[in-house]
Amino acid sequence: GIYGAAVDKDGNFWGSQLSQGYLVNINRQTLQYKTWPMAAGGYGMTVDSKGYVWTCSSTVARFDPMTETWQTNSVGGSGGCMEDGKGTLYMSGSNSSIIAVDTDTLQVKTSYPVPQYVHGISIDFYGYVWGVSMGSEAYRLDINQNGAFQTFAGLVGAYTYSDMTGFALSNVGQPCG
């Protein structure tokens, strides 16, 4: 079944399966669907501001809906991922870090260390990158301050790998009315 899901700027549904399954697209207007084999195993997934679909794990994979082709790169990721609307995809790093990936080249731009492994990644409307552990802490990373971060403690069994701030809705479009 579908594990990760997102909506593109045209309101179409995208879903990915856990590990190396299939990417699914459902057209919002016709409800017709298409599937493609995933190019690499994926855990997290997102649709970026340019309409590319990403699956994230140890390998980052970018799907181009126009050409129906994949590009991949091994980046040492692990869990969730999200794009900032400015050309950087942030993802969970496998070694207690948050990895910044260039969305054009798929190359690692930099890696920001955090105190423990974070599984969930999200970006808020102020541009802060959030990482959530699977335990009791979340970190708010300020990329404009060389990766300085604040720790938010006292969480109980925190778990997410998806958009926890609502920022990904910026890629969907403006509401009508």
Show which residues each predicted segment covers:
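Short loop/turn segments immediately following the C-termini of beta-strands
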Residues: 17-20, 57-58, 93-95, 133-135, ...
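Short loop/turn segments that connect beta-strands within beta-propeller blades
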Residues: 26-31, 63-68, 102-106, 142-146
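Repeated scaffold domains used in trafficking and secretory/extracellular systems
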Residues: 1-7, 39-49, 75-85, 115-125, ...
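Loop/turn-rich, solvent-exposed surfaces of beta-rich toroidal or solenoidal domains
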Residues: 76-134
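A short loop-to-beta-strand structural motif that recurs across blades of beta-propeller domains
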Residues: 22-24, 59-61, 97-99, 137-139
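A short beta-strand motif characteristic of beta-propeller blades
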Residues: 31-37, 68-74, 107-113, 147-154
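Conserved beta-propeller blade signature
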Residues: 12-16, 52-55, 88-92, 128-132, ...
